[in-house]
Structure formats: C-alpha cells, structure tokens
Amino acid sequence: MILPMPPEPHRTIVRGWAILAVTALALAGLALIVPAASKVPALQNAVAWPDAFFQKGLVSHVALSFIVWFLAVLALISLTALRPPDRRDPTLPGAAGLVLAVLGTLAIAGAPLIRGAEASLNNYIPSIIHP
C-alpha cells in the first residue's frame, strides 16, 4: 500500500532534519581537522590556540558525529515513517524541536572556543565541563 505524500510543512521539517544531520557530520569533520592542525609543528607556535584546544575539539567532534547525527537521523526516520494525523498541525512542535536542535548543534560546535572549560575524555560520550 502506497501512502499519500505528507503535507508541505511536514516535508519541510523532514528536510530540515536531513540538512541538520549532514551539517553535523560536516562540522564534526571540521572539529577534527582544525584541532589536528593545532598539533602540526609548523602551526603549533604560529597560531595562538586556546587552552586544551585539541581535547575540546575532540569532544566536539564526538558529540557532533555521534550524538547529533544519530538523533537527527532518528528524527528524520521517525517523521518519515509516522504520518501526521489530519486533525493536528505538527508544524509548530516540529519546527520548535528543529530550532532547538540547531541551537544545540551550534553550541556544541562552539564549545572548543570557551576559555576556562575542561574536557572530560570519558569512554563513550566525552563532555566539556565549565564552571
């Protein structure tokens, strides 16, 4: 049985989650390349890197590539599989969730630049501790 296409606002939210998933992977790659460049001997002393930039960049890389990507793909698959009921408009809660996820992704991507923060390199999910 072929289901009918969902309404346009629903497709826009699904598209937003797909863009967030791809953007999280791109930022995760950048969050790995830039801290790795901070360990190159020619660049190590030429650029004033923040304190513990490599460790905090590694935390940001893992959080973006593991947590944000998986949750964005989960939202994408869930919204694709579950059709919104006709009597409710899922646009507002769906858009609010997407906006909050984008803001959280930007906060994770900017976390290595926070001064005074300390990277806690745990086994599975590392975190950044800030007083």
Task: Give the location of each predicted region.
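Hydrophobic cores of alpha-helical transmembrane segments in multi-pass integral membrane proteins
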Residues: 15-43, 51-85, 89-117, 130-131
